[in-house]
Amino acid sequence: MQNQEHKTALLVMDLQNGIVQHLGDNLEEALVPYEKAIKAAREHSIPVIFVRVGFSKGYPEISPNNKAFSAISNYGAMTVNDEATQIHKLVQPEGNEPVVTKYRVSAFAGSNLEMILRAQQIDTLVLSGISTGGVVLSTLREAADKDFKINVLADACFDRDQEVHKVLMEKIFPRQADVLTVDTWIDTLN
């Protein structure tokens, strides 16, 4: 049941085919924390919002000045219809759960995410995603600047660099968010 004091949404960020491959050989096991969080949110009527990165054909959104994204346009991948930008089959949206397309690292960048959140009067975000030092960090910072209350699910975030993940979870994120495990978050819902 949704807490009446705060209206919460779970953000599932960048769990798309072209990115989840970085989780390694045991993909199904690596996705378990995300699946648990999604299931719990649905059971407690908490909106689940999926976020992906994808670009238009011809990449008009990508500046050659953008070091991180300009290489993507050279590969001819990551367009909105490309298989790499589709949400992975193990964590698919259901029914009317929105899939937000962003054009930069933050889930807010160029997307309609803030409009969706404000329309539903959501003031608390639960963040999960790949990567911790990418979409999770950028979205957390922007969400904090927009005055959202923030929770980060430490075991439903991943970064190829475990040191970056650890430093962010233990030293940086706690300044602006509550960092907890999926199981601890689920316990707070009951």
Could you say what each language-model-derived stretch is?
Residues 6, 24-41, 45-54:
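A short alpha/beta connector and helix-capping loop motif
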Residues 10-15:
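Acidic-leg catalytic submotif of subtilisin-like serine proteases
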Residues 16-22:
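Short acidic, Gly/Ser-rich segments with clustered Asp/Glu that frequently serve as metal-coordination loops
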Residues 18, 56, 159:
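Active-site loop signature of alpha/beta-hydrolase-fold enzymes
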Residues 47-48, 52-71:
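Early exported N-terminus immediately downstream of N-terminal targeting peptides
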